[in-house]
């Protein structure tokens, strides 16, 4: 499981996650996620919210819902075409009022990247700092 996309995204045993805009072949794309629980709604608190973006301009409209689902200590992963990566950072900064920051990115499949956003350290719960 260590080299699957699931492992790289931190999705594994005991992880509760949800997806937005996942492709039809999502299970194959993700790989072995162990005993992770996939919710089909964005009811918080989620450990991981995985958002597939065809267009980074959707960030402004969806950010509040996605980040609320991951609050207080989860992560929002945005999956987009690698050429869109530079557009993700300022869009999230603006949509979150600077309260969320990127701290990791990975190459996935088909020329895509996934960028992880977490709350700024000083706004996280003490046990997650």
Name each model feature, range by range.
Residues 49-59:
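Short, glycine-rich nucleotide/cofactor-binding loops
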Residues 36-46:
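Short acidic low-complexity segments
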Residues 15, 20-23, 43-44, 52, ...:
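Catalytic cores of nucleic-acid ligases and guanylyltransferases
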Residues 60-92:
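Mid-chain, well-packed structural core segment of small domains
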Residues 1-31:
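N-terminal, charge-rich interaction modules
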Residues 97-129:
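Class I S-adenosyl-L-methionine
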Residues 26-33, 86-96:
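Short, aromatic/basic amphipathic alpha-helical patches
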């Amino acid at each position: 499981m260590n080299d699957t996309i699931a492992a790289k995204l931190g999705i594994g045993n005991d992880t509760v996650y949800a997806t937005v805009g996942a492709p039809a072949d999502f299970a194959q794309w993700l790989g072995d996620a162990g005993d992770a629980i996939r919710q089909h709604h964005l009811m918080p608190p989620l450990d991981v919210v995985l958002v597939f973006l065809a267009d980074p301009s959707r960030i402004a409209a969806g950010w509040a819902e996605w980040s609320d689902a991951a609050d207080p200590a989860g992560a929002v992963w945005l999956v987009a075409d690698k050429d869109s990566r530079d557009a993700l950072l300022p869009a999230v900064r603006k949509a979150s009022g600077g309260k969320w920051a990127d701290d990791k990115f990975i190459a996935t499949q088909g020329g895509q990247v996934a960028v992880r956003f977490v709350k700024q350290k000083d706004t996280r719960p003490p046990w997650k700092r």
